[in-house]
């Protein structure tokens, strides 16, 4: 447990102790102490609504309860400078600022581990995200889903969850047949032969490239081959090509996966039949009008869903149910799916299936990724100027850089539409949040280098009584808030909470830098203490940027 968490725990215990001393409630009647961080700094470092929570038990007005808690509160034990009461009975706590300096050695010693919490307690969580069809380039929605999904995984891991990242390969549906047919057309074209493109065929540059490569490698070998054999080969060849491209693009985007799970394997291993049988055994499947139905309305869906159509073919739902059953059979406690906005209506039926299989209602969580709109020169941009086609993830990275894409996509709540300002993303000004954050890190590294050149090295065993200014305390309070930001981001599944935190930390750093001198030639002890504060800030900022997949440059 880090020093910031210790401070909060001691404060909570002292609030409980004050309640008992005041005779307001028995120990068993005291609710969990909730501490909020006020947005307005003039309202203290922490605030609690304990007085309102106790009103019914104590049979007194919240304001009177608050006064009695304050009267019996031990400020010394909790390192509190002062308390006050606001509104109907909120109690505001102002920390003893000198106590905050204990954070500096704590962060220096923790290093990369600073910010870790154990709210996850080793719970096994599987996060499935991106899962784009392997039939073309990743578009902006996939890119946002990749950035959000990866950041969420990083945050969950930092908060003590055992996380597995998974990509579901849609390699069994009709889209793969269309891929094979599209590759066939481009293969024939590469040999100077004509073949009509299917109506729903894929017309991307990558399909043309596959056709050319096939022609170069195999010549006209497939022209007179049996069509079924030719298409089977093209299906495998095209799928392998597209998957390699997807893996490479995601790797370049700093998005790793632990598992690439093939939909085809569900058919090969009989898992679809097993899932159907499991639902049937529990009485949630029935036959009607020649089709097989899932009684999903039992679990809150607005209508029952077809699993097997009259012609004997499966709907998308049945293999998806089998896939989710397989996830749970692998021992995960929680499933988190990061889906595009077009999947919103699909959520109730999947949650119904999880419940029908005998699992708790909240076992499956779905995070929806809303649409992205690009703006350049204040105007909405629909097509890439380079290709004349829809903008891909690769195009966007080339336009503004990898760090800007990762930061901007992690900056907003995933379930809100996003306007991505391309001009802002490349500007070298404080208005550009990624530049603002990275410049803060580079600025700290510059100060640390200057200190080293003068033989001043930060250390954990210094005299930190030299840390006394308001700007230093503000910076320390922000550093101390990092574990809390990680915990909240993990618990609420909101990785943008970390991005908000990064901005706050960068602001506190820039504000300190503009007001105070780090290295004072006349005072070596003070200089070393401030350099240690800078090192603690650098560690925290670097750790936070890592969570959202953004680099922390030492020079800019």
Swiss-Prot record:
Its main location: cytoplasm. GO terms for molecular function: arginine-tRNA ligase activity; ATP binding. It is found in: Cytoplasm. NCBIfam families: argS. It catalyses: tRNA(Arg) + L-arginine + ATP = L-arginyl-tRNA(Arg) + AMP + diphosphate. This is Arginine--tRNA ligase. InterPro entries: aa-tRNA-synth_I_CS, Arg-tRNA-ligase, Arg-tRNA-synth_N, Arg-tRNA-synth_N_sf, ArgRS_core, DALR_anticod-bd, Rossmann-like_a/b/a_fold, tRNAsynth_Ia_anticodon-bd. PANTHER family: ARGININE--TRNA LIGASE, CYTOPLASMIC (PTHR11956:SF5), ARGINYL-TRNA SYNTHETASE (PTHR11956). Its EC number is 6.1.1.19. Pfam families: Arg_tRNA_synt_N, DALR_1, tRNA-synt_1d. The lineage of its organism: Bacteria, Bacillati, Bacillota, Bacilli, Bacillales. It comes from Bacillus subtilis (strain 168). Monomer. It comes from the Bacteria. One of its GO terms (biological process) is arginyl-tRNA aminoacylation. Keywords: Aminoacyl-tRNA synthetase, ATP-binding, Cytoplasm, Ligase, Nucleotide-binding, Protein biosynthesis. The gene is argS.
């Amino acid at each position: 447990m880090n020093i910031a968490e210790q401070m909060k725990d001691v404060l909570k215990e002292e609030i409980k102790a004050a309640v008992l001393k005041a005779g307001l409630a028995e120990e068993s009647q005291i609710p969990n102490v909730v501490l909020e961080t006020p947005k307005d700094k003039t309202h203290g470092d922490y605030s609690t609504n304990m007085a309102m929570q106790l009103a019914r038990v104590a049979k007194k007005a919240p304001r009177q309860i608050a006064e009695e808690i304050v009267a019996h509160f031990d400020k010394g034990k909790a390192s509190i400078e002062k308390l006050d009461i606001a509104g109907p009975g909120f109690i505001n706590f102002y920390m003893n600022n000198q106590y905050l300096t204990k954070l500096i050695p704590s962060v220096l010693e923790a290093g990369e581990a600073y910010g870790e919490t154990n709210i996850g307690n080793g719970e096994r969580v599987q996060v499935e995200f991106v899962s784009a069809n392997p039939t073309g380039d990743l578009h902006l929605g996939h890119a946002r889903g990749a950035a959000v999904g990866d950041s969420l995984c990083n945050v969950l891991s930092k908060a003590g969850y055992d996380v597995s990242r998974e990509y579901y390969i849609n390699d069994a549906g009709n889209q793969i047949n269309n891929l094979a047919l599209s590759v066939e057309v481009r293969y024939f074209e590469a040999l100077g032969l004509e073949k009509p493109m299917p109506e729903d065929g894929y017309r991307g540059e990558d399909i043309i490239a596959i056709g050319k490569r096939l022609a170069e490698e195999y010549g006209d070998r497939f022209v007179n081959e049996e069509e079924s054999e030719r298409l089977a080969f093209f299906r495998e060849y095209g799928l392998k090509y597209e998957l390699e491209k997807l893996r490479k693009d995601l790797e370049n985007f700093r998005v790793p996966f632990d598992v690439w799970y093939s939909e085809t394997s569900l058919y090969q291993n009989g898992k679809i039949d097993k899932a159907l049988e499991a639902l049937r055994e529990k009485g949630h499947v029935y036959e009607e009008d020649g089709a097989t139905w899932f009684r999903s309305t039992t679990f809150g869906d607005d209508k029952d869903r077809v699993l097997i159509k009259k012609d004997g073919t499966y709907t998308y739902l049945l293999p998806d149910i089998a896939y989710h059953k397989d996830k749970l059979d692998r021992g995960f406690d929680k499933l988190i799916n990061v889906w595009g906005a077009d999947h919103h209506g699909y959520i109730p039926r999947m949650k119904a299936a999880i419940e029908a299989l005998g699992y708790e209602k909240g076992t499956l969580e779905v995070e929806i990724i809303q649409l992205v709109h690009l703006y350049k020169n204040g105007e909405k941009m629909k097509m890439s100027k380079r290709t004349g086609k829809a903008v891909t993830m690769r195009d966007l990275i080339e336009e503004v850089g990898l760090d800007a894409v990762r930061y901007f996509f992690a900056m907003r709540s995933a379930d809100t539409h996003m306007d991505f300002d391309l001009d802002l993303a490349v500007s070298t000004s404080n208005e550009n949040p990624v530049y603002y954050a990275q410049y803060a890190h580079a600025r700290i590294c510059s100060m640390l280098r200057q200190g080293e050149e003068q033989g001043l090295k930060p250390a954990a065993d210094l005299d930190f009584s030299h840390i006394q200014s308001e700007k230093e305390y503000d910076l320390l309070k922000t550093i101390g808030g990092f574990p809390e930001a990680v915990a909240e981001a993990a618990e609420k599944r909101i990785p943008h909470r970390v991005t908000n935190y990064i901005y706050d930390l960068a602001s506190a750093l820039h504000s300190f830098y503009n007001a105070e001198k780090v290295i004072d030639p006349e005072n070596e002890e003070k200089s070393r203490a401030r350099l240690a504060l800078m090192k603690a800030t650098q560690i925290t900022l670097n750790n936070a940027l890592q969570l959202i997949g953004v680099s922390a440059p030492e020079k800019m």
